[in-house]
Structures are given as C-alpha cells and as structure tokens.
Amino acid sequence: IMIQLLDKIHHKDSKNFFLIAGPCAIEGEEMAFEIAEKIVKLSDKYKIPYIFKGSFKKANRSRVDSFTGIGDEKALEIIKKVGEHFNIPTTTDIHENAHAELAASYGVDVLQIPAFLVRQTDLVVAAAKTGKAVTLKKGQFLSPESMKFAVQKVLDSGNDKVAIIERGNSFGYTDLVVDFRGIPTMQNYAPVILDV
C-alpha cells in the first residue's frame, strides 16, 4: 500500500486506517502548526498514521474575489516547516503543471490532483514525473472504471506511487453521494482512499 512508501509516516505498522487532515487552505503559520500539533497528538494517542494536508493555493474558487491563498512560496514554506517540525509527511493539491515541481521542491511528499482536473494529462504526468506519490481525486462526473486511465498516466510516467481518492458522484447539482460499489472496481487499478 502507498502509505508504506512514505518514510516519515508514524504508526505505519499499526494496521489502523490512516488520516489525511489539515486546514483547507494554508492561511498562516500559527494556524497550520496548531492544527498539525493537535492532530499529531491524537494520531500518536490512537496509533493512526497521519499525513498533513493543506492547500497552498485554492485555485478552484467559485467567485473571482474569493480567498485563494497567502502566496504560493509562503504557503509551501509553511507546509515544509510543519512536515519538518513534526516529522510527518505532507500533501497539497496542485492546479497547474508548474505547481508539481514547485511543490516537490518544498519537500511535499504527496501531490494531489483535484477532482475537476483529474483528466488533465499534462498535469497528471507533471505530478508523476516528480517521483512523489500522487493521489488522484475521482471527479464527481467520472465512473469508477474511467479512473484506470488517470492511474495509467501516472504508471506510464514511471511512477508507481499512486492512489485514488473517492469523494462521491454528483447527485443533483450540489450534492455528492459515494457509491461504495465502485470502490472494488477502482482497487483493481490502485489503492483507494475515502474522502469523508
């Protein structure tokens, strides 16, 4: 399983579920450290492997005047400091090809491809070519079977550290519903992480 490949993961032999958690967006160092510290304490108490997640840039906002971040390098530096201070792996989502190498240069361990961008070949390949682990959020518009193509793009780029994140399918216009029947199908292609 991909979690075993992350050097800094604590409690990887606990046979417990693992947790990816953190602030939606990096808004400042103090908040990021406070969140990470609390989750690390809980993950140590309950022997839960933990990966810190924070978006350095929220590029997929509904409105043009919505908060998108504090600056790419500033936010990535905070993610790097959190990972180093707590000796934990980190993940962030990327939205442009250049973000893959940028995030990797700050030591991010796992590059996440957002659901709306999971079919963007150049972005997926750019993430894969960094050699970092790649998580592919299943688009709410995709069937489980179609995720094999996104996974194959990572594999064809010479990277076997890939997992799928299931986050649900569109149910009406604004709701998402997880169809658990698709998880075994996607497990044929890569490990599956449930985003709840």
PLM region descriptions:
Residues 48-55, 89-94, 194-196:
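Short beta-strand segments at enzyme active-site cores
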Residues 1-20, 77:
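N-terminal amphipathic alpha-helix/helix-capping segment at the start of soluble metabolic enzymes
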Residues 23-32, 50-72:
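Glycine-rich, proline-tolerant flexible connector loops at the mouths of alpha/beta enzymes
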Residues 70-71, 85-100, 109-122, 133-144, ...:
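Catalytic beta/alpha-barrel core
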Residues 130-196:
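Catalytic alpha/beta core domains of metabolic enzymes, predominantly
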Residues 37-46, 65-91, 126-133, 182-192:
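Alpha-helix-loop-beta-strand connector modules within alpha/beta enzyme cores
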